[in-house]
Every structure is written in C-alpha cells, then in structure tokens.
C-alpha cells in the first residue's frame, strides 16, 4: 500500500481544493480541522472529531471535506 505523510503541504492542498471546489471562504474549514481529520483517519479513532464545531454545527462542510480528502488521499496509508 502506498504511504502518504501528513504534513503542512498535504493539509494546505486539501484546504485549497475545498475552497476552490465549494466556493467557500477560508473560515469554512481550518487547517487544524483538516489535520485532526487526517490523524483520526490514520488512527481509526474518530472521537476527537465528534466534538469539533465543524462536525457539530457544520456537518455539510464536514462531509464535503471528507469527499475532498478522499479525492486526494484515496486509500493510501497515512503516516
């Protein structure tokens, strides 16, 4: 399985794609939220995400962000 490092470049690429594709402003999703989602995806423990404003109050943006992450990361192993 191909491996992909969770780093600032990956996080920024995801945010840029999200903003371009969904015509959202930069406050729609934070770099911190993206990094947290990537870490949870890596570990398989989604508990930390369930308490975020993104998940609780803006579930639509959360789902859209998941689509963008999958389009970039796919099934690659995050390390």
What kind of region is each of these model predictions?
Residues 1-79:
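Function-determining sites in protein domains
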């Amino acid at each position: 399985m191909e491996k992909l490092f969770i780093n600032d470049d990956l996080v920024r690429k995801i945010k840029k794609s999200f903003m371009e594709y969904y015509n959202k402003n930069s406050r729609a999703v934070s770099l911190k939220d993206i990094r947290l989602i990537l870490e949870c995806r890596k570990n398989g423990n989604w508990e930390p995400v369930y308490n975020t404003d993104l998940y609780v109050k803006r579930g639509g943006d959360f789902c859209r962000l998941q689509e963008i992450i999958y389009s970039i990361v796919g099934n690659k192993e995050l390390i």
